Regions:
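Acidic, Mg2+-coordinating active-site environments of NTP-dependent enzymes
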Residues: 10, 134-136, 158-166, 182-274, ...
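ATP-dependent carboxylate-amine ligase catalytic core
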Residues: 53, 58-61, 87-180, 196-198, ...
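Nucleotide phosphate-binding/pyrophosphate-handling subdomain across enzymes
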Residues: 162-165, 173-186, 190-194, 204, ...
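Beta-strand->loop->alpha-helix junctions that form or flank phosphate-binding loops
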Residues: 222-223, 237-257, 276-282, 305-313, ...
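C-terminal helical cap/extension that packs against the catalytic core
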Residues: 225-240, 327, 371-433
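Active-site-proximal loop/hinge segments that shape catalytic or ion-binding/gating pockets
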Residues: 439
Length: 458
């Protein structure tokens, strides 16, 4: 294996072909990546991305890849697959997005975030690749393209047995769809989100997601939405691909406890299996079942190892109890909010408690509908809203007005997430649960605050 010299500081002498952005400074790798516009004006086509991979030696061609698309549940499916494969004894690379706190969260090897050393070395290699390709007339990679190349590089260097690859946006034109021979294509639940890019109907969005389906590659998909299922099945039949439609009829909840759900699954042969799902959200049962069927489709049916792996699955900000009675859920669209509310309401009813809510959202989401759903579903006591530290974040005044119009509970606005969290933690008592929801940016800020250990003893 080639040995590269590690330099934590990377010399950048590059004029990017994106707007008029010019950089000629010494920066760390993360600073360099952060200055790449997420939505480059000149994005590389899939054919061009293939050329980048060819220049890298086409590392993806020798990888066994699970390719995951969908609106909600992608990250959780990746986490279930990762946990099961690691427990079976395989070395696994996982590429997901977005990150909550640290950009390195997007790259995991055997369930652990890559080291700073690994991250910087890979960034340097991809930066040098980008410079070579620009000299040949290609555009500098977009933010997500750059991270995708880093993932392929890291997983190649780590000599992983399997790769779990989550799409960034959509499927058909997504950067990750450059891969040609995945083991299985997986499509999670589909709902209205990113409509400005993917279309304004379920059918249009499903068509974009179904773009990851490839000839000769089995597809496993969430079949609970009739409209989405029809589109996915049509595409699979067009390509003569075997498909496995999974829905709520394929499992039943046996019991629940403080850890999560015990569910009974049907495998593709109609045989029952009992699995423990460590989550307070029933929506994770469907994600676990999708993962189970995908492993079957890949010929990896070591049931005992899968069961143990699933029972150890961890995925942040999905009905995550970060301290007793305090839950984080990254739901950020109406369908995700509905799944969250189903789980939160069951917790309130089971524990006979009311709910305190911290809510924030970004401006390009259907925040008004999400707020109405929250206000009309949960037995609310306190509602705290705050502006998240993002250009896309809604102003506190807008959030406050929206909640006040539909909610009779005590609604308070705060200038920061930390102030809102501090208020709820100071005011909480044994009769209420605290739920934080509405945006993954919000989850990241809360986790950053909690990391400072300011709230020990509350």
């Amino acid at each position: 294996m080639e040995v590269f010299t590690f330099r934590k500081k990377i010399k950048i002498n590059l004029i990017m072909e994106v707007g008029t952005l010019t950089m000629n400074v010494n920066e760390t790798a993360e600073e360099y990546i952060d200055q790449i516009p997420m939505w480059a004006r000149k994005k590389n086509s899939l054919e061009d991305i293939r050329r980048f991979l060819y220049e890298m030696g086409e590392p993806d061609e020798s990888m066994k890849i699970f390719h995951v698309a969908g609106t909600n549940g992608k990250g959780s499916v990746c986490a279930f697959l990762q946990s099961a494969l690691i427990n079976t004894g395989y070395r696994v690379g996982t590429f997901t997005s977005p990150h909550l706190i640290d950009i390195k969260e997007r790259f995991c090897i055997n369930g652990k975030m890559v080291s700073e050393d690994t991250f910087f070395r890979s960034c340097e290699r991809v930066k040098e690749l980008s410079q070579r390709m620009m000299e040949k007339g290609f555009c500098h990679p977009s933010y997500f393209e750059f991270l995708f190349y880093m993932a392929m590089d890291m997983f190649c260097q780590a000599e992983v047995d399997y790769v779990i690859l989550e799409t960034g946006l959509g499927g058909r034109l997504d950067t990750t769809n450059v891969i040609r021979h995945p083991l299985v294509s997986i499509i999670t639940s589909i709902s209205l989100d990113h409509t400005e890019y993917l279309g304004d109907t379920i059918e249009k969005i499903a068509w974009e997601k179904a773009g990851i389906i490839k000839e000769g590659v089995p597809v496993v998909f969430d079949g609970n939405d009739i409209s989405a299922s029809a589109v996915i099945k049509s595409r699979a039949k067009e390509l003569l691909v075997s498909f496995d439609q999974v829905d709520k009829q394929d499992y039943r909840i046996i019991n629940t406890n403080d850890i999560g759900f015990c569910a009974q699954f049907l495998d593709t042969n109609g045989k029952n299996h009992e699995l423990m799902i460590p989550s307070h959200g029933e929506y994770q049962v469907m994600n676990a079942l999708l993962s189970f069927r995908a492993l079957e489709a890949a010929g990896l049916g070591a049931i005992k190892s899968i069961k143990e792996g699933f029972s150890n699955m961890q995925w942040p900000a999905r009905m995550e109890e970060v301290m007793p009675g305090v839950f984080l859920d990254g739901a950020h669209n109406p369908a995700g909010i509905e799944a969250f509310l189903e789980a939160a309401l069951k917790l309130c009813q089971t524990r006979q408690k009311k709910a305190d809510i911290m809510f924030s959202a970004v401006s390009d989401k259907d925040y008004s509908l999400m707020i109405k759903k929250v206000a009309n579903t949960l037995p609310l006591y306190h509602v705290a809203v705050a502006h998240i530290d993002s250009e896309r974040g809604l102003k506190t005044e807008i959030l406050l007005k929206e909640f006040q119009e539909v909610c009779g509970s005590q609604v308070k606005g705060f200038s920061s997430v930390e102030e809102a969290l501090s208020f709820l933690l100071h005011e909480r008592d044994e009769d209420r649960l605290i739920f934080c929801v509405g945006s993954l940016y919000l989850m990241g800020e809360i986790k950053t605050v909690l990391r400072r250990n300011k709230y020990d003893g509350f």
